[in-house]
Swiss-Prot record:
GO terms for molecular function: cytokine activity; cytokine receptor binding; oncostatin-M receptor binding. Keywords: Cytokine, Glycoprotein, Immunity, Secreted, Signal. PANTHER family: INTERLEUKIN-31 (PTHR38652:SF1). One of its GO terms (biological process) is immune system process. Il31 transgenic mice develop dermatitis. A similar phenotype is caused by local delivery of Il31. It is found in: Secreted. It comes from Mus musculus. Residues 1-23 form the signal peptide. This is Interleukin-31. The keyword Signal applies.
Length: 163
């Protein structure tokens, strides 16, 4: 038998301990989430986006139509994920402010942040029209909620065709 002398054994023990520590702590440092958690989060986003849009369009923007000139990127998990998620989060934060917190987007923002591998970029979204006008604010909020809901529904359709 060949016996190794030196620091091999302590190094392996240290490596195993650090590897275990990193594996248990990595989720809090922005590591990718598991596929199960991702699937659950996407399902929650789909449902919440639809609920937010339906509630707002019925209760606060009845009879109004969305502004087609405002374009929100669709949700994706490809190379543009960080940028798309950052833009969506910025729009949803603006929705919360413009609706005077009557539209609570905090859960959606939290879920989007959780599935992003990096911290989302801080973006400033300009609102078309006069923000002092209630109508312009409502149209903006309705448009963002509708587009986000539609994007999540399209994601649902793509999921159903690939399964």
């Amino acid at each position: 038998m060949i016996f190794h002398t030196g620091t091999t054994k302590p190094t392996l023990v240290l490596l195993c301990c650090i590897g275990t520590w990193l594996a248990t702590c990595s989720l809090s440092f922005g590591a990718p989430i598991s596929k199960e958690d991702l699937r659950t989060t996407i399902d929650l986003l789909k449902q919440e986006s639809q609920d937010l849009y339906n509630n707002y369009s019925i209760k606060q923007a009845s009879g109004m139509s969305a502004d087609e000139s405002i374009q929100l990127p669709c949700f994706s998990l490809d190379r543009e994920a960080l940028t798309n998620i950052s833009v969506i989060i910025a729009h949803l934060e603006k929705v919360k402010v413009l609706s005077e917190n009557t539209v609570d987007t905090s859960w959606v923002i939290r879920w989007l942040t959780n599935i992003s591998c990096f911290n989302p970029l801080n973006l400033n979204i300009s609102v078309p029209g006069n923000t002092d006008e209630s109508y312009d604010c409502k149209v903006f909020v309705l448009t963002v909620l509708k587009q986000f809901s539609n994007c999540m529904a399209e994601l649902q359709a793509k999921d159903n065709t690939t399964c």
